[in-house]
A protein has these predicted regions:
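A conserved ligand/cofactor-binding region detector
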Residues: 1-817
Length: 817
């Protein structure tokens, strides 16, 4: 291999240079000229021209990382919801306007190209978007690191709304290719499944396995206004045997490719339906596939500059984004003790210094577990390692706790009640040097409730790092009108230091600024109204209050509470049409998991309510209900900047943090919410007078439950609520199928109302009256909106990553000089 430095053209980014680069890439990269090029070809050529400018930074960053022998962060996540890359890269490089001019000079509309780029379908919701924000901030701060995940061929699904119901279609986002990625066919690792184990002296050999190849695909993650970059490395499954030639020659063409198809299914689809045994097994195979390849890859990278594992923990930090990647722990142990023959105690000691784990849920039923039988069949060696870790852990705790048998059962990594299951979150805690929650309340409840025993055993391990979002995408990119206004007033440095937004507080009494702020918001509302009129055929007044609840459809997020208020408001308007109502457009967006029947029923209820409300001539423009289909990053960039009101109404104690609340507040939406997750910290940051708080607190929820909560009593005592629920029960919104929503009624009224929808309804309705009153005074509303933007400094993912780097990973920024 040559060590000679390559000579290459240093690309500048003038309009002429960009135009020439696009032309070259069209000719030599796409293989077309201007006569035959189609719009997607122009997008591909422009993307390659931008990618070329990132690569030199990428190479420099990689070389400096090796020269400085830095500690690297390996961020493992099943999801990376990165959205579109083109605009983000232009803003990071500072070449948005030059690129627009360059394309215009070639007769191409850049805005049309931007709309053609598909979202990378590598995630579903907040978990994946958080991971993407973190990669952006790591690169911007110069934190050396890699994101690792799976290169799904299909996303979770493309959501269509047909007759008010969710219909799932394949999301083949790679149909036109992906110009941003670099296939690395030379970087492949064997990933094993099944087989059996054999003791070979002082180590164990795993034999008779089936295997699949994991091939790397790399994408450059640019930092903003810096030459530092990082890498997102995604694994794609490749069959170790492409074709059974003997079967093919016999004419058995299907059998000839069966093994290849089965192998490559591992990276085919994000979150296969796990309501069947086959779906659950595929999910487990996915999780192990990506962590096995990742652990092999980080060992290879470490060994390039180190001959022993003595400094392994000094140079490697592995972060687990939720429990999906927890199998990385036994896999790294297996590689160290069985392949590299590191003694158990030394290997385990290194692992406990390297790993950290972020918990994202307070609901015990959402903590991932795997049954012992399946693990024994698919990953027999890993189960042995988990059993040994558990035995040593329980022995240590038993000696310290005076042999408390009940506690030992509670904290065992293996749940022995009923079907034996391995508790993945517990394994992560035992192996990690730090475990963090993602908001102050979440971290408190995590150590008080679901992990209370572990918090007593390892008090020093538990900490809080409140989530954050990247302001580059969620304000600079998503809302050009508002970000341009802010630039005019305080400059552009807020993109790197979000606390700069505090200076906007000085302008809340400046009439010219308040008017300009309101106009920027109005432009965003017009943009969204135009989009929805085209895509949903629903038109509405852009001067109405835009009321948004955009998030995964789940009972704990309480879209039902919002729907009930919509129905009550609808009934009130019909009863009093002459009253001066504040016009309101209530928008929902989000996907329901394909196997989650209740969530899909909630979507159908929203659809049926929308159909009734939007076609009632007595209602007119005073109330509209819209479900925006296929919610993802690009849809969010369109819808979030237009919001007036942000619905963050989960039952207190259920939402770990939330990041949609931060994105909406950053764009000047006022929050209506419970004291849950990061809402509490947003309330502190923007002032109680600039947010609408309602409902039971987490402690009050516990007290109400302990006292014997009776939702039917609430139903009977509130006439407006009772009428709305009866309309749901009797088919008022579903005359074609009157019993369609009977389960919703019974869940809320007769089956315990687990998420306290009815308990919080009266307080929610009162808070909505406050919303109406504030919105009637545009000046007061806009001043509160300005306060929300100004208070968002602490919710930048740059702050979050800075805390991770200092407190958890113990890693320093790369010296780019």
């Amino acid at each position: 291999m040559t060590a000679v430095d390559l000579e290459f053209d240093q690309l500048n980014s003038t309009v002429d240079a960009l135009r020439r680069s696009i032309s070259n890439r069209m000719m030599y990269g796409v293989g077309k000229d201007a006569v035959t090029a189609r719009p997607h070809d122009w997008l591909h050529a422009a993307a390659l021209a931008v990618r070329d400018r990132l690569v030199a930074r990428w190479m420099k960053t990689t070389r400096l990382q090796y020269e400085q022998d830095v500690k690297r962060v390996y961020y493992l996540s099943m999801e990376f919801l990165i959205g579109r890359t083109f605009t983000n890269a232009l803003l990071a490089l500072g070449i948005y306007e030059p690129m627009r001019e360059a394309l215009a000079g070639l007769g191409v509309d850049m805005e049309a190209l931007i709309e053609m780029e598909p979202d990378a379908a590598l995630g579903n919701g907040g978990l994946g978007r958080l991971a993407a924000c973190f990669l952006d901030s790591m690169a911007t701060l110069g934190i050396p690191g890699f994101g690792y995940g799976i290169r799904y061929e299909y996303g979770m699904f493309r959501q269509q709304i047909v007759n008010g119901e969710q219909v799932e279609a394949p999301d083949y986002w790679l149909r036109a290719g992906n110009p941003w990625e670099f296939p690395r066919s030379e970087i492949q690792y064997l990933v094993h499944f099944g087989g059996r184990t054999v003791q070979r002296g002082d180590y164990v050999e795993w034999i008779d396995t089936q295997h699949v190849n994991a091939m790397a695909y790399d994408t450059v993650i640019p930092g903003y206004a810096t030459s530092a970059t990082n890498t997102l490395r995604l694994w794609s499954a490749r069959a170790s045997e492409e074709l059974d030639l003997s079967a093919f020659n016999r004419g058995d063409y299907r059998s000839a490719v069966d093994a290849k198809t089965m192998s490559e299914n591992v990276s085919r689809l994000l979150y296969p339906d796990d309501s069947t045994p086959a779906g659950r097994e595929l999910r487990l195979r996915q999780e192990y596939f990506f962590v096995s390849a990742t652990m092999q890859d980080l060992i290879r990278r470490y060994q390039r500059t180190h001959s022993t594992f003595g400094r392994f923990a000094e140079k490697v930090a592995v972060h687990l984004n939720d429990t999906h990647p927890v199998l990385a722990i036994p896999e790294l142990m297996r590689l160290l003790i069985d392949v590299h023959h590191v003694p158990w105690d030394k290997a385990w000691g290194q692992i406990q210094q390297m790993f950290s784990y972020t918990n994202h849920t307070l609901m015990p039923e959402a903590l991932e577990t795997w049954d012992v039988e399946t693990l024994a069949r698919l990953l027999p060696r890993h189960l042995e390692i988990i059993f040994e870790i558990n035995a040593q852990f329980l022995k240590h705790v038993s000696e310290q706790s005076g042999h408390d048998a009940e506690m030992i059962r509670r904290i065992s990594l293996v749940d022995e009640y009923g079907q034996r299951r391995v508790r993945m979150a517990y394994l992560a805690i035992v192996a990690s040097q730090k475990v963090n929650g993602v908001s102050k309340l979440h971290s408190q409840l995590m150590t008080r409730d679901i992990f209370a025993d572990f918090a007593r055993i390892y008090p020093e391990r538990f900490t809080n790092v409140t989530n954050g979002i990247t302001p580059r995408r969620w304000l600079a990119q998503a809302s050009p009108s508002l970000s341009s206004l802010i630039d005019e007033q305080i400059g552009t440095h807020w993109r790197r230091d979000l606390f700069e937004l505090e200076r906007l507080r000085e302008l809340r009494n400046d009439s010219a600024f308040v008017d300009a702020f309101r106009e920027a918001k109005r432009q965003n509302k017009l943009r969204l109204a135009h989009h929805l009129a085209h895509h949903t055929k629903i038109s509405f007044d852009p001067n109405a209050l835009f009321d948004l609840q955009v998030k995964r459809i789940h009972e704990y997020k309480r879209q039902l509470l919002n729907v009930l208020h919509v129905i009550v408001r609808y009934n009130q308007i019909r009863a009093n049409p002459e009253r001066d109502w504040v016009p309101r457009v209530v928008m929902f967006a989000g996907k329901a998991a394909s196997a989650y029947r209740m969530a899909k029923t909630i979507i159908k209820l929203i659809g049926d309510v929308s159909e009734k409300v939007n076609h009632d001539p007595l209602i007119g423009d005073r109330l509209k209900v819209v479900f925006v289909p296929n919610y993802g990053v690009s849809v969010a960039e369109l819808i979030i900047p237009a919001a007036d009101l942000s619905e963050q109404i989960s039952m207190a104690g259920t939402e770990a943090s939330g990041t949609g609340n931060m994105k909406l507040a950053l764009n000047g939406a006022l929050t209506i919410g419970t004291m849950d997750g990061a809402n509490i910290e947003i309330c502190d940051a923007v002032g109680r007078e600039n947010i609408f708080i309602f409902g039971h607190t987490a402690d009050e929820v516990d007290s109400l439950r302990a006292a014997g909560y009776r939702p039917r009593q609430v139903y009977e005592e509130n006439p407006e609520l009772r009428m709305a629920l009866d309309q749901i029960r009797t088919g008022f919104f579903s005359p074609d199928d009157p019993l369609r929503f009977s389960d919703i009624f019974h869940t809320l009224v007769d089956w315990g109302d687990h998420y306290m929808v009815l308990a919080d309804f009266a307080a929610f309705a009162e808070a909505q009256k406050e919303v109406d009153e504030r919105f009637r005074t545009p000046r007061a509303w806009t001043e509160s909106a300005i306060e929300n933007v100004a208070g968002m400094g602490q919710f930048s993912s740059d702050r979050t990553i800075g805390e991770y780097a200092r407190e958890i990973w113990h890693v320093k920024s790369l010296d780019m000089s």
